[in-house]
Amino acid sequence: MTTVINRKYRISRRLGINLWGRAKDPVNRRKYPPGQRGILGFKRLSDFGKQFAAHKKFKFYYAISSKQLRRIFLDAYNRKGYTADNFIGILESRLSSVLYHSGLVPTIYSAKQLISHKHVTVNDKIVNIPSYRVKPGDIVKIRERAAKIPVIVEAVQKQERKAPDYLEADSKEYSVKYLRIPQYSEVPYSADMEVNLVVEFYSR
């Protein structure tokens, strides 16, 4: 887990933002890229560079590949309504996202790991696919044996992140209910994710 967290810190410094809002993130003190020449600062980005950087924010925040992110965008684009809202709605309906934003796990990576190891249920059925689409009304729960894992116990005890309004978390039952599909402004991002630039990036 320490290796994963250190990798996350490096990603934050590369992007120049505290992507996950962790208090100990080195980017809070060193606002320049990692590496020997990082202290020289960030280069001024072109319009494409800004769009590409915004796309990377979402890729790293949700711990998914560029290919997956593009597929999600195309799905959002082909739906009725605003593409940006559709895009966020799909990302936030992923099982790993619901579990992470519940505050019952410390990181998006730990959420994905728990799911992959069959420690999570949706409506009392085991689901081991992090990208599984949760529907409004579904109840996601960490199985009893996994609730004793130290990082889970610590996350629940600390309650560093409060579940957003579209989720109803129950720390005693290690469960979270997905109430509704959120809009961009409701998601508790720690940084400006610039979703409009992502739409521009994929619309080129």
From Swiss-Prot:
SMART domains named among the record's database cross-references: Ribosomal_S4 (SM01390), S4 (SM00363)
Family: Belongs to the universal ribosomal protein uS4 family.
Molecular functions per Gene Ontology: rRNA binding; structural constituent of ribosome
Alphabetized UniProt keyword annotations: Ribonucleoprotein, Ribosomal protein, RNA-binding, rRNA-binding
Any one GO cellular component localisation term in the record: small ribosomal subunit
A single GO BP: ribosomal small subunit biogenesis
Stated role: One of the primary rRNA binding proteins, it binds directly to 16S rRNA where it nucleates assembly of the body of the 30S subunit. With S5 and S12 plays an important role in translational accuracy.
Organism: Wolbachia sp. subsp. Brugia malayi (strain TRS)
Record's subunit section: Part of the 30S ribosomal subunit. Contacts protein S5. The interaction surface between S4 and S5 is involved in control of translational fidelity.
Keyword Ribosomal protein set for record: yes
Protein name: Small ribosomal subunit protein uS4
Pfam families reported in the protein's UniProt record: Ribosomal_S4 (PF00163), S4 (PF01479)
Alphabetized Gene3D superfamilies for the sequence: Ribosomal Protein S4 Delta 41, Chain A, domain 1, RNA-binding S4 domain
Annotated ranges, domain S4 RNA-binding: 93-156
